[in-house]
Structure formats: structure tokens, C-alpha cells
Amino acid sequence: MFLLKVLSKAGITLALAGSVVLTGFQLDESSSVETSKYDLSLAKYVAATPELADKAKELGFDVSKVDPAEKIANNGKKFQQPGDNHVAYKEATGDIPVLVILAKYKDGDEPIGDLDGQVPAKYYEDLIFGTEYNPYELDVFKEYDGPNVPKDRTMQNAYQESSYGKTHLMRHENTEFAWVELPKGASYYLDQEGTYAENGRYVLGNVNGDAHTGEFVRDLLKAADDQIDFSKYAENGEVPNIFIVHEGTGAEWSRDPAQFWSHKWNLLSALYYGKYYETGIPADVYEGMSQDEWIAKTEDEAMTYDGVIVNNYNIQPAIGGNVAGFNAATGEYDEASVTGPYPAQVGVYAHEFGHALGLPDFYDTAYNSEGVGNYSMMAGGSWMRYPDALQYNGNSPTHFDPFSKIFLGWVNPIEVKPDDGVQKITLPSIDQADDDNGIVKMAVPGSNGTEYFIFENVQQSGFNQGLIRQGGDAHGLVAWHVDENIINLYQTAGFRPNNVANWMNKRFQHNQSQTASDGTVVTHYGLSVLQADGKYDLEKYVNRGDAGDFFKSGDKITPVSGNVHTGSYYFWKGYGSTPADSGIHVTDIVENEDGSITAKFYYSTNEGKKK
């Protein structure tokens, strides 16, 4: 999820006003208003490419469009210690149906820089459902082939590897994939000049298709209705998610305003806010209706197919690269900025479908920090690559983080408890582990199980081969901190769990003792990586990860181990105090020759606590 569109606080209030029925594999925001079963919310975008983010830092332009009011999340509680706000996990195992629609614009009206014609549809079936994907046999991509280029980097394989074989993506149709043509072209859906806007202008803009995204999805569903039996995918009368692949590239490559930015959203909200972007007035007010009346009308006219509701969707591009040559620093198009076209890769696809399964973004969508950086599919990890070259961006994304694996029911972590004594545990590389031997979990005593640390062994093998982007030494034990009280706010109030300051001089200040009561006091991530070198590069927006983040042979982590420690993030005692001693120790770390890691995990409360 990336760019939140700029709305007024009133718009944000509307965005959080609806409640949502949790159907299928979808988990979305909800709140106290019960007048509608639908969620009027803002889109969730994939992270910008590392190249675009780095260029923004170097040249000083803002890559985000996040509204500060996004942080308004009324949890209704203050607490001086960890709360009891657990995340509601949502298992995603077994056969998971994925309804895929390939969308092409009206012939002769394609996006700037697009290919001549479409990539044959079978390649997207391979990329999403297959076990092999070889776009390099096509003439347009042949130059990027080579002996070290993997051909097994599919969404199916990514989910299989991260879930330890528990999740299988499938489709109900036995027909071949085919492109569905829209009734209008790119010049309409992505128009920048106001040609198709009311009164010849967009009040708030059609950047990345803001004003017409809802129409794009609505028109696509109507065009595909004769080819798809939507009822086959429905659960409790609603299709959980539509997976849209659109012709052209994505704005996440360049910030090009005339391209869609890959995201997860719902049709109702896209239509509602589309009219807002065009006219400055949301759709219900524009049409002189109450919100309930407008929702009922839209459900009947745009969201009902084969007797079921179709609302939630995610959208991603058919090709990669800055094919139009948009220069984000100047706001102009130039030949020197052109990259690609590159074949579509699994990273963005798998990331966006993670949202469909209920996962939040674990990067900072305001681009003030990096969140968990390259260490999760739900953050910058969706852009990892092998070989380490631009044309392979996203072809070898990092595994889903261990919290996400727990959330989706993919793993049963080894739980070490205070009474267990010293546990000497050998962890295989996370890509070679089983579902019950790859992750160690240690809860902070007194936290009601909502605050805990997780440890995993990450090596450059399997999909994690893409970590070569951080150099050959980027491997070892990765330590995570989880605060479910904060992640819970994603489910209950739409709060972005990693859009906060998290580094040392912020994390233990006085306002750490309360959370989300007025929307401004959350001062640590819901999910964070404890970087072994203690530099807090992720929090300080220095990089998305480096070799210094991994714990290696001879390292240790304790409640008082310098700048990086397992001290609780709660129980603040005042300025100058150390954080509460959780007792959590990981010592005697050894990276073995076979890639496994052996370490001692134990509790020793108050041992060696700094005064």
C-alpha cells in the first residue's frame, strides 16, 4: 500500500465510517458505525521501487502523498503497560481461489510507452498459478535472459515456499486466459488534462487514475461478465477479491501520474472517492442522495454479477519499467529516463495479494522511514531480485515476515517460555524449514501475549536469494519485535502500523505509555527488525537493509545489550530510565557450515540490568 490520496479530514472520517463484513480471505478496517456493511476506505499501495525512493532522497522530492490525518485512529484506550488488543488472525491455507482478469484498453488508445500489442495471456497464468515462468522466450524480453536468471519465480511458488506447502492458489475456470477489452482507452481512465473531467478540469486531480479508477474496475467487470461466472468465487454472497492485471506499467516504477499505481482497494470506495477527486464532492452528495441510498444504487448497478457482490480488488501492471520516461524530479517526460519494458515479476503481485488475505503494509507509507525494509514481502522485500540488476526488480522477493506467517496460519513457532530454562535450538534456513521448526517466539512477561520477539534464520537461498541486493554477507539471524496492540489498529481503525517514529530516542519517551487515543501518540512500529549493528538505518530512512542487520556467530541480544536489545517497549519509568527488562536472551549464536544457526534462547529476568 503506498500513496494515500490527499483528502480532507472530513474525507478521512468518511473513509473510516463504514464497517465491513469479513468474507473469504479479506480482512479490512471497521469501526463503530453499523449503518452499512461496506467499507469506504482509501487505497493501499505497493511500495515505490528502491530506485525511485533513492532518487527522491537524493534530489529532495516527496515520493508520497500521505494525508497526516491518516494517523487518526480512535482505539479508545490508554494504557501504562501492554494492552490486551490481540490481532485477529486469518488463516489462509488449502486451495485459495484467485479470480484473475487481464484488462486491455480500447484498441488504439494505450498508455504512453506501452508495448505494441499485449504479452500473450498464458504468461500471466504461468506467473500467477504456474511453477515455471519464462517471459524471456518472447522477443521483447529476450535480451534479459541468461544462465543465472531463475525461471521458477512465480506467485504460486512464492506462496508455497513461504507457507511450507500449506497454501495453493487455484482458479475455477478451465478456459485459457484471455485479455478483456475495456470500452474506453487510457486517455480516458488516466487523463491528466481534464479533457474528460466535469467542466473540463479535475478539482483534486486524476493522478494515477484517481478520478476514474472506479470506472475502470466497473467497466472491466461489465466487460468480463459474459466470460466469468462470478458466483463460483463467492463466499457468503460476495467474491473476496478480484485480481486485475492491467495493460502497461505501474507508477511505482517512476511516479508517472499517467499510470496506475498498484494497489488494493474496493470498487465502492473507488467510485465514491473518484467523484471526489474529480469534483471535490463525494459521489453521494454529488448525486443528491444519502450515503445509504447511493450505496444501494451502486450495489445494484455496478457491484452485482451472477447474483453475488463483487467489490474488493487488487490491481497490478502487465509490464515493468519507466516505459514513458517520466522524470519524477522535473515532472516532465524525457528519453533519458526511459527504462524497460521489463517482464512482469512476482513481487508486486504477491504483495498485493497479501493485502487480499488481510495483511497490512509493514513499510512506512509516508516515506519518513523504511519500516521493516527488505525483510518482508509486505514491505520493500517485494522488490528483491536475482540477478542483482534493474530488469529483474521483484523477481525474487523476500519471504513473508514471521508475524505474517503466524497470522495466516502457516507456522507453529517454537515458543520458549520463562520456565523452560536454557533452550539450545538449531534453526534451518527459513526457506528450508518446516512449519514447526523455523521460528522461535518469546513473549514479554506481563504483556498478555501482545508483545513478543521472533527469531528466524535468513540465508540467500530459495526466494531469499534476492537478498543479494544487500551484498553477499546479508544473511544470519533476524530478530523481530511485534506489538499486536498497534497492528490491531489496522483491523479496527485503519491505522498504518509502521507509519511512526521507531528509533531509540523516540521509542522510550513519555508518550510511549499510551497508544492511539488521540491519533498522535503511537511512537513505535507494530512490527520492527532489531538491526544488529544498532544504527537504526531502517527507522532513520538510511536504507532498506544491509548486512549489518543480521546477528552472526559470536553476537548476542539481551535486555541490556547496548543500542539493540530485547527490553519491553512498555512500562516506561521516566527520563533516564532503561526500558523494562523482559529477561529475553539469545546468546552463543553460531552460523553453521550447512547454513543453519544454533543459539541459546532463555529468560533471565533482571540479570545484569543497567542501573
Question: Predicted regions: what is each one?
Answer:
Residues 2-27:
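Sec-dependent N-terminal signal peptides of Gram-positive bacterial secreted proteins and lipoproteins
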Residues 33-46, 51, 111-118, 123, ...:
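Non-catalytic C-terminal accessory/binding modules of secreted extracellular proteins
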Residues 68-92, 146-316:
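Active-site-proximal segments of metallohydrolase catalytic domains
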Residues 85, 90-125, 204-207, 248:
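Fold-level signature of zinc-dependent metallopeptidase catalytic domains
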Residues 189-207, 334-339, 343, 356-443:
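A domain-level signal for the mature, folded cores of soluble proteins
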